[in-house]
Swiss-Prot record:
SUPFAM superfamilies: Peptide deformylase (SSF56420). InterPro entries: Peptide_deformylase (IPR023635), Peptide_deformylase_sf (IPR036821). The lineage of its organism: Bacteria, Bacillati, Bacillota, Bacilli, Lactobacillales. Belongs to the polypeptide deformylase family. Binds 1 Fe(2+) ion. It catalyses: N-terminal N-formyl-L-methionyl-[peptide] + H2O = N-terminal L-methionyl-[peptide] + formate. This is Peptide deformylase.
Amino acid sequence: MILMHDITRDGNPVLRQVAKPLTFPLSDEYKKLADDMMQYLINSQDPKIAEKHQLRAGVGLAAPQVGESVQMAALLVPNDKGEIIFKEVFVNPKILSESVRRTCLAEGEGCLSVDKDIEGYVPRPDKLKIRYYTVDGEEKTIRLKDYPAIVASHEIDHLNGHLFYDRINKQNPFELAEDTIVIS
C-alpha cells in the first residue's frame, strides 16, 4: 500500500525528468504499480481510510511521484457530489490536441509531491484529446473537458518533468486571459 512517506517530494530530480515510455506486455511489477497507484487514490478519497493512514486526498498520481520514472499515471476524478466521473490508468499518454481556451481551478492547484501551498491560477486547456494505453495494452483515444481535463493535464505534466507551479504567471499569479473559464 502506498502511503504518504512513499510519495516523492518536490526537489527530488525524478520529478523533473521526462519519464520513459513503457513496453507491452507490462511486467507484473508495473501492473502492481498501476494497481497500487489507483488504490492510493481510492483510499485517499475515503475519509476513514485517509484519516487512519494520514493520506492526503488525491485525484491523480503519476509514477514519478512514487519514484518510478515511467509513463504511467492513475486518475480517479470525482464530481462535486463525490461521485467518480473518470477512473483510468494511463500508460504512455500523449495529448493529441487541446483547446485554445483555458480553464483553471478557482482555488488553484495542489500536488501530493508539493507540501507547501503555492498560490495562483494554473491555466490549462479546457478540452483535451488524449491517446493512451490501458494496463492491458489496449490503445484508447478520449476527449476530456473541464475538471477531468485539468487532472489529466496535471498528471501528464508530471510525466514530462513539469510541476503545476511552472504554469503560474510569476509576475502576476492571479492574472488570466480574458476568456479563461474559472471552475469553482
